[in-house]
Structures are given as structure tokens and as C-alpha cells.
């Protein structure tokens, strides 16, 4: 891989690492699995050599596929490859993670995979509805429906929690 492509990837990672991580965690629901998926994608891209012109949707698609592959491999083995402490919502000992972050994670867990992914991409990763639809390979109307349905469920969940 050329040094300019290497620098391009490095710059992309620095700019989007948190968004990629948030997206991968929304799929895997496990921190280490999300990190592994992202690591795998960037290793593959570094080996590949040529990069597409529009990196953002391409790399998010690669991370999605790697995260889903991680889930499939775990399911095929029929065992849990994750330690209880790595699951979303579990705090590390001595962690100062605000309760609201844990609450948000718990609320997102109650949505379908499609709704959760769409909301994370739209709100946290600033994807347009068209970008979400392209990434997920679904019609635009499907992506917007997942988003609206997910937000409606979140409003209901928040209202129930605040009673």
C-alpha cells in the first residue's frame, strides 16, 4: 500500500474511530467484539492497497459486515465468546461512566437490530437517510420506517422509565 493511502486510512480512523466503534457496538452489543471487527477491517484495508474514492460509506459497510460475521461465528460455535463484563451496560470496576449512557444503552437494547442500527447511524454517526439505506441495502422508505418506529419505541421506553 502506498504511503498516501496509508495516511488516508490513518486520517479516516482518527476522524471516525468513535463513530465506527459506536456503530459496531450497536451491532455486536459487546465492546471487545466491536473493537475486533474494526481492527480486522483496517488490517484488511491496509493489505488491499487500493481504496475506493468515497471511504466513509465503504468502511462503515465493511465494519457492519465484520461485526455481523463475528456474531455469526459465535452463533455457529454455539457458545458465548464474550465475558459477562464486556456486555453493554456492564461497567468496569471503578468506571465513572454516567448513568445516562448506561440507560441509553439499555434503551437501545430494547429495539430491534434494524431500528437500533438506523438510529445509531442517523443520530450518532450523522448519516443521511439515503446513506443509511445504501449501507443497509434497503429502500429509503424502509430506512426511514425503522428510524421512526425506533424513535417511537424510545419515546415510550423513556416515558415508562420516568414514571
Please provide the spans of the model-predicted regions.
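A short, charge-rich alpha-helical start-of-domain segment used by transcription regulators
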Residues: 1-22, 32-35, 50, 116
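Sigma70-family region 2
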Residues: 2-3, 39-55, 73-75
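Acidic, proline/glycine-rich intrinsically disordered inter-domain spacer in sigma factors
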Residues: 11, 77, 84-109
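C-terminal flanking helix
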Residues: 17, 21, 42, 112, ...
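Structural recognition of an alpha-helix C-terminal capping motif at a helix-to-coil junction
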Residues: 22, 36-43, 53-65
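Arg/Lys-rich amphipathic alpha helix in sigma70-family domain 2
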Residues: 54, 61-82, 97
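A short pre-motif secondary-structure segment
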Residues: 118-122
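DNA-recognition helix of helix-turn-helix
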Residues: 130, 136-163
Amino acid at each position: 500500500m502506498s504511503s498516501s493511502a496509508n495516511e488516508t486510512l490513518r486520517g479516516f480512523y482518527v476522524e471516525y474511530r468513535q463513530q465506527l466503534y459506536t456503530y459496531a457496538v450497536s451491532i455486536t452489543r459487546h465492546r471487545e467484539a466491536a473493537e475486533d471487527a474494526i481492527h480486522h477491517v483496517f488490517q484488511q484495508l491496509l493489505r488491499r492497497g487500493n481504496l475506493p474514492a468515497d471511504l466513509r460509506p465503504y468502511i462503515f459497510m465493511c465494519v457492519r459486515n465484520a461485526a455481523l460475521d463475528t456474531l455469526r461465528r459465535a452463533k455457529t460455535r454455539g457458545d458465548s465468546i464474550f465475558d459477562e463484563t464486556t456486555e453493554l451496560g456492564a461497567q468496569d470496576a471503578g468506571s465513572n461512566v454516567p448513568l445516562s449512557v448506561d440507560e441509553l444503552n439499555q434503551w437501545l437494547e430494547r429495539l430491534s437490530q434494524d431500528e437500533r442500527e438506523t438510529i445509531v447511524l442517523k443520530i450518532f454517526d450523522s448519516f443521511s437517510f439515503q446513506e443509511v439505506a445504501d449501507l443497509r441495502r434497503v429502500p429509503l422508505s424502509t430506512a426511514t420506517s425503522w428510524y421512526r418506529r425506533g424513535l417511537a419505541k424510545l419515546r415510550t421506553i423513556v416515558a415508562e422509565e420516568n414514571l
